[in-house]
Amino acid sequence: MKIIITEQQKKTITNKSDWKEGNSKLTKTFYFKDYKEVMPFVNSVMKIADKQNHHPDMTVHYDNVKLSITDHDKGGVSEKCHKFVNAVDKL
């Protein structure tokens, strides 16, 4: 069952933070100068994920990190996902 988020939530995600919705998940790539900037970001995301008990898929490269988040229990994007992306965007 795919969870539908409200149009307002979609506008917030799309317009303010560049998260893309597709395949029942939210995805965003964050770009950095180099690996020394990447790893502190990854550690900060890990802390958010542990605190919220909602863990993204992360792909780490030399100068970027791709995050994808979905709610496996709900079968798609949920309010938990929305809360997670808002917290990450505050980093």
Residue ranges and their predicted role:
Residues K36-N43:
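Short amphipathic alpha-helices within nucleic acid-binding modules
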Residues S17-E21, M46-P56:
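Short arginine-rich
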Residues N23, V60-N64:
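Short Gly/Ser/Thr- and Asp/Glu-enriched loop/turn motifs at secondary-structure junctions
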